[in-house]
Regions:
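Extracytoplasmic/lumenal domain signature
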Residues: 23-37, 43-75, 79-115, 119-380
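Sec-dependent bacterial lipoprotein signal peptides
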Residues: 1-25
């Protein structure tokens, strides 16, 4: 017990929170953001089902509202609040942007590129960086970008996941982390096989984490112990969608799977025709997925035999975005299409610079797209 205690102290010291150091490099911004946002963005794409935009509609012919460059290139998916959005930038920064004007309110330097995108919770922004050997997880103040705390970790490229007062992160070295959000203390570290590129998923039964070693794990929330594991037909590179007791995911070998929790048994397995790099989404009782060859899949969650597919004649690595008025998809060549879910016909399209690597998002009728040059474009 004494040896274990000393080892725990050494580990805790090495992965210690470094709030003083990060505060010393902070430069106050000339513009301030809001003190808080009422709507949270706690997981990749906003909700566990990836259906944050399902009640939204677009105008019949959306027009460019603004275009913003906030650095060399935006990486990852944005976190969208009611008045602002937050993005990670390739030149080691996080930026807060006014949704009405596209004006950058502040930029904060961080230790590496934010590949997985930020999370937004009330008066805080959470980000993790890709860097070796000094990657960090941060909590930033929404109003001015000032670091509240930072914690050293291995390099992180996967999106984070927030669950109450707990933050989960998966590293490039295949380690899952649980952190406390009040001060950034690491509660546990669980080494897994393979790198973690997909967002971890907090579920009622534990934390689901997929690795590039073609394995899906279910970890105990309290300890990080492995409760179940499943060999997947290919790697899972985007966060699974969670709906009740099921996970829905796509793999690099072109399979779409429904996985039952907590045993991680396969409820159904459907051939998508090509690799699936983007995250599936669940809207009401239907699963939406987009294969690399541009095939849009519309799958009744409980009747997969009734699945329909539409060849959209695009190449895609981003997942689809279900709306009330259709399904948004984006291509590696820069096209954004609004697709009719009944016929597969394109009701609207716009050409941007490609590749578009993250799903387009809509809030309050405003379409937000991260263009291929790393700029942010808003349409209404």
């Amino acid at each position: 017990m004494k040896v274990g205690h000393r080892r725990g102290i050494l580990v805790a010291g090495f992965w210690a929170v470094n709030a003083t150091a990060c505060a010393s490099s902070y430069v106050p911004p000339s513009k301030l953001g809001p003190a808080r946002q009422e709507t949270s963005w706690p997981v990749y794409l906003g909700t566990p089902r990836h259906d944050a935009c399902v009640a939204e509609s677009l105008n019949a012919d959306p027009r460019l509202l603004w275009r913003a460059d906030v650095g060399r290139a935006v990486r990852g998916s944005p976190a969208i609040g009611e008045t602002v959005l937050v993005v990670g930038v390739a030149d080691r920064a996080v930026a807060l942007v006014d949704r009405a004007t596209g004006q950058a309110l502040w930029r904060t330097r961080v230790a590496g590129t934010v590949q997985g995108g930020p999370l937004l919770e009330s008066d805080r922004v959470y980000v993790a960086t890709e860097a070796a050997p000094d990657a960090k997880l941060y909590a930033l103040r929404l109003r001015d970008g000032q670091p509240i705390w930072s914690t050293r970790t291995e390099s992180v490229v996967a999106p984070l996941a927030l669950d109450g007062d707990t933050l989960y992160a998966g590293t490039e070295t295949g380690v899952m982390l649980r952190l406390e959000t009040d001060a950034g203390k690491i509660a546990w570290r669980r080494p897994l096989g393979g790198a973690i590129r997909a967002a971890p998923v907090p579920t009622p039964d534990g934390i689901a984490a997929a690795t590039t070693a073609d394995t899906l794990y279910l970890l105990d929330r309290a300890t990080g112990a492995v409760r179940a594991r499943l060999a997947t037909p290919g790697a899972v590179l985007a966060g699974p969608a969670l709906d009740g007791s099921r996970l829905y995911l796509g793999t690099t070998s072109g399979r779409l799977l429904a996985i039952e929790l907590p045993a991680l048994t396969v409820a159904w397995d459907l051939a998508a025709g090509d690799a699936v790099f983007g995250a599936p989404a669940v809207a009401r009782d239907t699963v939406y997925a987009l294969a690399r060859n541009g095939t849009l899949w519309v799958i009744p969650a409980r009747q997969p035999a009734a699945a329909r597919s539409f060849a959209l004649a695009i190449a895609a690595t981003a997942g689809p975005t279900p709306l009330a008025s259709g399904v948004l998809v984006a291509s590696v060549s820069g096209e954004v299409l609004l697709v009719d879910r009944g016929s597969g016909a394109a009701a609207w399209r716009v050409q941007l610079d490609g590749p578009i690597e993250q799903p387009p998002l809509v809030r309050d009728g405003q379409l937000v797209v991260i263009g291929g040059r790393g700029d942010i474009q808003a349409y209404r």
